[in-house]
Every structure is written in structure tokens, then in C-alpha cells.
Design a protein with these regions (language model features):
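C-terminal motif of bacterial Sec signal peptides marking the signal peptidase cleavage site
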Residues: 13-14
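Sec-dependent signal peptide recognition
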Residues: 1-6
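Accessory carbohydrate-recognition regions in carbohydrate-active enzymes
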Residues: 18-343
Length: 345
């Protein structure tokens, strides 16, 4: 009798199954498509140009983070990504649903680079996203790109074709704003640093697992880009780039990288990102409703916490509106705009 009761208890316990994680309900692509139809817009379009969408982005980020590591399908656009687009120009490190940011775009490349025409085609069939993680296959260069991030740092992982000559393009002269000033340079065998000054100056300190041969400026009659050439670039290991960012200095960007990411693997950073989102989403537990309604709720919950964005470093320093470096001992964030409160509307 006791054995039967014990067996029944085990069976009933097993029938409960594993509870679905809330991050599994999130669709980071929700809100990335442009609205075209009158029933969505509330009016009939008179011109053929793009109209409004929710202006969300599918890339890797944490709640209210400094870094938003996301694909750019179009510059001078809202969040930089439009679902109906068919090419990717790079993976930028800041984003929101407005026509600015998209700092320091990077793209893995192979072969000779044409600065005016380097973008790669992609398909949604070979693209995926999850809170804190993004993946896409770049058709032109035959590279599988994976991205994850911490609060102030970005982690790029690029798997090239066997025997392909790996390079990294940094479109240092382009963002969603006019770039007034910029700098990029090799510091040592595995480090490059610099800044980009458009609508505010952002600094970066980046480490690569392949030794850097040179940082080459490549120019044509249309544009100029930086290209990192690597020693032993045909190695079998994926190219990995860990980049720390700061709105104060390169030294602070280095400090942020050391504190948050430097000694961690890609898988570890991605797992920690998922855990951070799970902890936030778990603040609200939904009862009832359909699976579709839960996906909508947690996807919009997810998007709502992408902004405002962190602007202070791990030492609490930040650059204020007067351009002065301040340390008040707390986390400093961007001003929230009220119309962005529920960006995924």
C-alpha cells in the first residue's frame, strides 16, 4: 500500500512538468514591422514612403541598459531595424525608437571591401532572437552572427566558413546622427579602442580573440570605413569581440568591460542576460488568458523596459547635460520621453 502511494505521488509530481520560463513568451520582433494598412494606421496613406511602426528592435540588451546590440537594416530610421528590409549594414551598440543613436556599427566581412556597398542580405528563416540574445546568418559573407550583452558591454560571436579570411568592418563614420569626429586605433595585439561623436560622444574599448594585424581605413568615392585585419585569420575558432562602452572615457569603457564581461564566455553572458529578463518579467505573474495573450503581454512588458537607458559607468561617473563628468554615487539614466513609455503601442 505504501509503495503504491509513493509511486502515485511520483507520477503526479512528474505530471506537473517544468513550468515554462517567462522569457519564452517574449517575441523580440514584435513591433519591428512598419504599419501599412489603413485599419492599422487610422488613415489612408497618400505617399509611398514608410509610415509609422512601433519602432522596436530585436537585438540583445538588458533592462534599461547602456548597450543595445542590434542589427541595422537602415540608417536614418527609427530603431535601425525594419522587419521588411532585406539587408544588414552592421550591428550597432545603442538604439531606441527614435532617429538617433546606432553607435559604432560593426560587421564581420570576408574579402575585398567596397565602403559604399558592403551590406549583407539575410532572411528571417535564418534569424532568431530571445531576451538578451540575437542571431542571424549573413548571406553575403557566409557568417553566422550571434550577439549578447551586459549592461555596458557587447559580445559579438561570428562563425565564418571554413578557411575564410576573417575581417571586422567598423563603420566608424556612420550612425543615425551626423558623425562630427571619430577615432579608432589598435592598442595592442588583441585590443582596439576609439570613440564616435555624433549626438554625444561614446567611447569604446574592445578585445578580440584573434590577434589584430592592422586597422585599415578603406575609402572609395562614396564612403570610408575601418577594417580590422587579423593575424592567422583563417583559424577555425569563431571571431569573438568583447566591447565595453562609456559616455565618459576610454578608460571607463575598459573598466566597464573588466567588471562585466572580460573573463566570461559567450554562453555565460547569454545565460545571465536571460536570467536578468526572467527576474524582471517574474515581477508580474499572469493567470488565465490564452497563450497568444501571454505572448503579447510579456513581449510588450519586455519592450517597455528597454528605455530609459543607463548612462553611468560602474564607478558611477557620467557626463551630464553640460558636458561635465559627474559622480553622485548613483545610477544615472537618460530622460524618459512620455510618448516612449509604452513603445510597443
Amino acid at each position: 500500500q505504501y509503495l503504491f502511494l509513493l509511486f502515485a505521488l511520483i507520477v503526479l509530481t512528474g505530471c506537473g512538468g517544468t513550468q515554462k520560463k517567462l522569457t519564452e513568451y517574449v517575441n523580440p520582433f514584435l513591433g519591428t514591422a512598419t504599419m501599412w494598412e489603413p485599419e492599422d494606421l487610422g488613415y489612408t496613406r497618400k505617399i509611398k514612403s514608410r509610415t509609422w511602426g512601433a519602432e522596436t528592435y530585436p537585438g540583445a540588451t538588458l533592462p534599461n541598459a547602456m548597450v543595445q546590440l542590434s542589427p541595422v537594416t537602415q540608417f536614418r530610421s527609427g530603431a535601425g531595424y525594419q522587419y521588411e528590409d532585406t539587408v544588414i549594414y552592421g550591428f550597432s551598440h545603442t538604439a531606441k525608437g527614435h532617429w538617433n543613436l546606432l553607435h559604432v556599427p560593426m560587421l564581420p566581412v570576408v574579402g575585398t571591401i567596397a565602403p559604399g556597398n558592403y551590406c549583407s542580405g539575410f532572411s528571417h528563416e535564418k534569424e532568431s532572437a530571445h531576451p538578451g540574445y540575437y542571431q542571424v546568418y549573413l548571406e553575403r559573407y557566409k557568417v553566422n552572427a550571434e550577439l549578447t550583452s551586459t549592461l555596458r558591454c557587447a559580445y559579438h560571436k561570428y562563425t565564418f566558413g571554413k578557411g575564410d579570411d576573417k575581417s571586422l568592418l567598423v563603420d566608424i563614420r556612420r550612425s543615425n546622427n551626423d558623425v562630427r569626429d571619430w577615432k579608432i586605433e589598435k592598442v595592442d595585439d588583441n585590443t582596439f579602442t576609439g570613440y564616435q561623436d555624433g549626438d554625444g560622444k561614446i567611447y569604446f574599448y574592445a578585445k578580440t580573440n584573434y590577434k589584430i594585424g592592422q586597422v585599415e581605413m578603406v575609402k572609395d568615392d562614396k564612403h570610408e570605413v575601418a577594417v580590422l585585419r587579423f593575424i592567422d585569420s583563417k583559424g577555425v575558432e569563431p571571431l569573438e569581440v568583447k566591447a565595453g562602452f562609456s559616455f565618459v572615457s576610454i578608460e571607463n569603457a575598459q573598466m566597464n568591460l573588466k567588471a562585466e564581461m572580460l573573463n566570461k564566455s559567450f554562453a555565460q553572458v547569454a545565460e545571465e542576460a536571460d536570467a536578468a529578463w526572467e527576474a524582471l518579467l517574474s515581477k508580474i505573474q499572469v493567470a488565465g488568458g490564452t497563450e497568444r495573450e501571454k505572448r503579447l503581454f510579456y513581449s510588450t512588458f519586455f519592450h517597455a523596459f528597454k528605455w530609459p537607458a543607463l548612462r553611468s559607468d560602474v564607478n558611477h561617473e557620467y557626463t551630464d547635460v553640460r558636458g561635465e563628468v559627474v559622480n553622485n554615487g548613483f545610477h544615472y539614466y537618460t530622460d524618459p520621453s512620455f510618448w516612449d513609455d509604452y513603445r510597443n503601442k
